[in-house]
Amino acid sequence: MKLSVIIPVYNMQDTLERCLGSVLSQLTDDMEVILVDDGSTDGSVSLAEPWLLQYPQLRICRKDNGGLSDARNAGLRLARGQYVTFVDADDEVAPGTYAALMDLLSREEDTDILEFPVQVHYGHSSQHLFCPPSRRWSSARSYWLHTEGWEHTYAWNKVYRRNLFDEVLFPVGKVFEDMYTIPRLLARNPRVRTTQQGLYLYRWNPQGITVGADGEALCQLLQAQMQAAHLMHTHMLSLHGWRFHRSMLCRQLDVYRLTGRILLRWPFVKLICTLHTLCR
């Protein structure tokens, strides 16, 4: 088995057929699709059952509700592919994507993480394309800094060598789980390649955590960014490092405005937060 596609599902009755159809239409004999029902109450996964006879590579795993991270981890435990990738149940994958990516991986066999383009907010007025350069990176840290990896820590526009997850799992109970997970994978110094082939269609979700994040959620995001800065040895005084730290400072200002908490222990941060609040 070459590739396992993991799709967590929780109450996605309106979008699952479209999502699953976009993936199943690309199936080959050396691929499998693992649908993880995370305790849905709307009968979402029953929509997939008619496809079981047509697609023997489709498997359905049912479990009690544990959240997105727990569902992804359940899929990882079942995965048999040399590589794994993820799809959110309200998104889609453009035709021909997996064939192009697996062809590239067959020619670049030492690749551990392959990142591919995303149509961000697909179908919304804010739709825009994220398209990384086609290149092999000298190190995971170089990839992180030069592509500003903190701006696209998406789990689903990447194909991973499965054994990277032997020691890294998604954090159960956390929001912004990708910001916790991707830097931990990169800290294992995998061989990273980016490509302009393939396309993930990331649909705008007005109920998503990134749209309506409260103070506690933003605290978790900032904590994940702080962990990433440590893992990736991101120094404030370097050009690319400063951009990441600027992003962290902006997040700290949001956290202070909503909660009054200061998590960053930098000189003058408290003064900056106070002035920012007074000037609003």
Q: Where do the model's predicted regions map?
A:
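Nucleotide-sugar donor-binding/catalytic module of glycosyltransferases
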Residues: 1-220
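C-terminal subregions of glycosyltransferases and related glycan-biosynthesis enzymes
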Residues: 154, 203-280
